[in-house]
Each structure stands twice: as structure tokens, then as C-alpha cells.
Amino acid sequence: MQRKIRLMIGILIMTGLIAGCWKVSKNLQKELKEEMETIGEAEKSDRIVVLDAGHGGTDSGKVGINGVKEKDINLTITNSVKKILEKENIQVIMTRETDEQLAQSKVEDLKYRVKIMNEVSPILAVSIHQNSYHEENVFGAQVFYYQTSTEGEKAAGIIQDALQKVNPDNTKKIKANDTYYI
């Protein structure tokens, strides 16, 4: 009985996550459109965004109580964001489009993702990940940025504000970081 209850809770949580992602994507679309209007009539080639679906292949990331793998959630969200951006005539480069690991080791995998980002010089690079907590009451999306990047901090603020408009109960703040992960 406990197992069935946990399974149902897991399914409800996943349904909520998917619905939340849909709402977030709609709000992000509006926010991004407003931001892009301030950039002006830039050529499509100047409007490149790199989307990185974290983990992949044998690296599943976190695994939920219902067996859902972070790598799969990341790829689903990233594909949804890609569709929204492409509707706005923004060229999207994906670090991965399938369930694949980009290199043999985690370090090499991360380096390859960074290489993709550096080669295309995007206006924005976003890596999608999920966090897990032992406490059930901890929730909400949080945006991290590289601590010495003022542009990254500004972009993180715009994205975090859009996320909080969708879910006002999300009290998370943007967070600077200097570690090497995407």
C-alpha cells in the first residue's frame, strides 16, 4: 500500500512538474520576446542560443522515487524551450538532442559542452538541470550564473523573475557560482 501511495505521489509530482514547465515556458516566451525587442532587428545569425540538456547516456543525474531520471526531464524541458525560441526566429544549438553522453568521462563531457558553446558564440547559453532535496517542502526553480559575469547575472535575474511570475510561492533567488559545471 505504501508503495502505491508513493507511486501516486510521484506521478502527481511529475504531472505538476510538466504543467509547471509548460506555464514557465509560456512566461519565458513572453519575457524573452520583450527582451529581444530591446535588442532590435538583429539578424537571425546574431540570435543564437545554446541549450544544454544536462546529463545523458549512462549519466542519469538524479533519479526520482518513481524512477524518473533527471536526464530525461532535462531533455524534455530543453526541447520545449527550443520550440518556443524557434517560433521567435531564434537559432537554437542543442548540446544533445537524444539520450547520449558526449564523452567517456564526466570531465570530458563537460568540456565538450563548453566547446560547443564557445564555438558558436551565442547571446545566451542555458544548461537545464534539476536539484533534489531530502526535505519534501523544498521546491522551486533557481537560476545560477557565473559569478564574474555581469551579463550572466542580468540574464539570470530575468529568467528567475519569469519563473517567479509563474509560481509566486517560489522564493528562490539567483545564485552566483564559480564551480566548473554546466
Indicate where each model-derived feature is located:
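Catalytic-site microenvironment of enzymes
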Residues: 1-182
